[in-house]
Amino acid sequence: MSGGVYGGDEVGALVFDIGSFSVRAGYAGEDCPKADFPTTVGLLAAEEGGGLELEGDKEKKGKIFHIDTNALHVPRDGAEVMSPLKNGMIEDWECFRAILDHTYSKHVKSEPNLHPVLMSEAPWNTRAKREKLTELMFEQYNIPAFFLCKTAVLTAFANGRSTGLVLDSGATHTTAIPVHDGYVLQQGIVKSPLAGDFISMQCRELFQEMAIDIIPPYMIAAKEPVREGAPPNWKKKEKLPQVSKSWHNYMCNEVIQDFQASVLQVSDSPYDEQVAAQMPTVHYEMPNGYNTDYGAERLRIPEGLFDPSNVKGLSGNTMLGVGHVVTTSIGMCDIDIRPGLYGSVIVTGGNTLLQGFTDRLNRELSQKTPPSMRLKLIASNSTMERKFSPWIGGSILASLGTFQQMWISKQEYEEGGKQCVERKCP
């Protein structure tokens, strides 16, 4: 075995899973991540010489990054919000480093050079970005060993499988990724932009139609309880800073995400006005005190995930619903391995936590599955496992005794350069 072998559980390895919505990080061998905070970062152009360092603020050459929920939620003059990722891949490296620094200092509370790092990556990550990341981790953070693993493979491991079709529906996209014997089959990846953010947009439009204002909590000084459907009675805070549009939008989105999780439900059969009208309504109160019941719209909004044709403003024919994403992906794989994929369709990602998501998916797939195949849907019942499955898979992998020879050690990196990531990390 080349380059220092670490002993099984005592590795103290760190696992990072950085998604478009949140950053999950913690020690391998534990059952849930130590850190779970938004990937979105507040950015302020710092004035010269001024500026006190606050909790969760990282200063970099004239820029102050506000990282983590608390720092991000403080309204500040002109602070923009940004994300280091684009399409699931790292785009803004300076911002990405600020997130790593924050994770090490505030959550892991340890020096980077003491811990090997296993990081998850998008299955379509490019070679240049993988090499740049490897270089960053060894050169800037001086870590002893490194490994990159595709999110879908980690998700499969977290569910005790090495072969299966991973359906990952997160914030920015829904993807079906076939995994065979621990390797991603690139030709079978199918992506669709219909995911959590798309649902948020639909909710926003619903509020516009119903003429409901979205007032984020940071603007509210006091509110009075009002009757259902009555106009809200609330006081605005005085002396609010001039916040940027992007930051205000981010705060509104948080209100919408809460609404999504509390109210929406996926209909178990294709959407039907009559059936939806009989569904029990759900009561929801906005932060400013406005409250009302939601009926058919609870089912109508998430329907777009499964049947894009009835969403107005979408060229419906080009988009694939969730069920189609799965069957298309399996259809692009070799015929001999299809039974293994139908036999374990693994559901993961925060967006799949919508009520009724898996039931509807099961129904759609059982209609589309060829009669010769056995369909099995694997969806953990625990919210934690569904949100964190790539992280949990990484935690399992990095603490396996047999994995210890897989690390790219510092020595190997120094001898072989950043190219070794292509060779060692499939």
From Swiss-Prot:
Q: Please, one GO biological process term?
A: chromatin organization
SUPFAM superfamilies, per database record: Actin-like ATPase domain (SSF53067)
Essential for mediating its function in dendritic development: annotated span: 39-82
Domain of life per record: Eukaryota
Pfam families with a match to the protein in the record: Actin (PF00022)
What disorder is listed for this protein? Developmental and epileptic encephalopathy 76: A form of epileptic encephalopathy, a heterogeneous group of severe early-onset epilepsies characterized by refractory seizures, neurodevelopmental impairment, and poor prognosis. Development is normal prior to seizure onset, after which cognitive and motor delays become apparent. DEE76 is an autosomal recessive form that may result in death in childhood.
The record's comment on protein family reads: Belongs to the actin family.
What this protein is called in its record is Actin-like protein 6B
Question: What organism does the UniProt record list as the source?
Answer: Homo sapiens
Cite the source lineage.
Eukaryota, Metazoa, Chordata, Craniata, Vertebrata
